[in-house]
């Protein structure tokens, strides 16, 4: 083989290698550009501060995957790869914020749940953010609404008032979750505006789809779940005060394995003389809850406080329904939801910790939270104290 032939072969190989290098660099650049474009199209949520207490971070990172897996099992959904987005806050229009932190839970690229960390018991309400004990809860609260706009290159502020929850974007306020109130309307647009004070204070942003390094040891073991065998969500409370009616109907349908009960019929039975127009304003008193249960062949009794995990476990195994009686911590006498009723669906053990599963009639999905927490942080941004239970449905 002469030297000129060797030279030609060397040149050809050199050209091929340079071409491959150019192609790979181009692909790398395109990949980086695609990643940059994808990152630039991510939603940002406005917050006053992006600082989160370390104990909140650790608790969220340790628990979110197990909670998500347990809630997926309740809806017969396939489990997947769970990730935790950045925590955001919710504000009133005047700038007040609540004492909870909200984490988007991401599964296979979609925001599917919201992990809420809020004060564990009434005593914690008066403690600083760093000193209070936190309860962990998971639900689908505004998760779908966030998922729909997660890839939008925009900034929103999450707001709340007595009518529900809103997203504010470019000065426009949109209702995303309405409060169940007699006469309430699910208006899409609101004339409300963010206060100038709050606008000035919103100096930071968080990204709901940004996954941070998990510094805490993540645990996702669901060792045990026990629920009322035939429990189904068939209806949802909105423009009325029938929380106990919805809860009793759901529990009786479950324990009797039927679908004949509904909130309207129960309230009509309790208030036979009231017009249809006025019926949405009627609420239910403890003696009515007991008497209605007895009329359906159930021996109902009132028990003060939160039932123990062991009691819930046994009653659920025995196909006995428990209704939660809760009272708003704010104690506002003009509050149409000063009292609230919910249905206990069962219990679970996640990462060796005891949890309760319940249904809030305002929601279309179940919620899971710590069994030793007497505070319920419910759908429209208020804390309720679980003060008693009606047992026997």
UniProtKB/Swiss-Prot annotation:
Annotated control of activity: Prematurely activated/folded staphopain B is inhibited by staphostatin B (SspC), which is probably required to protect staphylococcal cytoplasmic proteins from degradation by SspB.
Main localization, broad class: secreted
UniProt entry keywords in alphabetical sequence: Hydrolase, Protease, Secreted, Signal, Thiol protease, Virulence, Zymogen
InterPro entries: Cystatin_sf (IPR046350), Papain-like_cys_pep_sf (IPR038765), Pept_his_AS (IPR025660), Peptidase_C47 (IPR008750), Staphopain_pro (IPR028076), Staphopain_pro_sf (IPR037155)
Post-translational modifications reported in the UniProt record: Proteolytically cleaved by staphylococcal serine protease (SspA).
Active-site residue numbers: 243, 340, 360
Propeptide: 37-219
BP-aspect Gene Ontology terms: proteolysis
Compartments in which it is found: Secreted
Site (Cleavage): 219-220
EC nos: 3.4.22.-
Pfam families: Peptidase_C47 (PF05543), Staphopain_pro (PF14731)
GO cellular component: extracellular region
EC class (word): hydrolase
Residues of the signal peptide: 1-36
GO MF annotations in UniProt: cysteine-type peptidase activity
Assembly notes: In the cytoplasm, prematurely activated/folded SspB forms a stable non-covalent complex with SspC.
Note from the entry: The cascade of activation of extracellular proteases proceeds from the metalloprotease aureolysin (aur), through SspA to SspB.
Similarity-based family: Belongs to the peptidase C47 family.
Purpose: Cysteine protease that plays an important role in the inhibition of host innate immune response. Degrades host elastin, fibrogen, fibronectin and kininogen. Blocks phagocytosis of opsonised S.aureus by neutrophils and monocytes by inducing their death in a proteolytic activity-dependent manner. Decreases surface expression of the 'don't eat me' signal CD31 on neutrophils. Cleaves host galectin-3/LGALS3, thereby inhibiting the neutrophil-activating ability of the lectin.
Name this polypeptide is given: Staphopain B
Natural source organism: Staphylococcus aureus (strain N315)
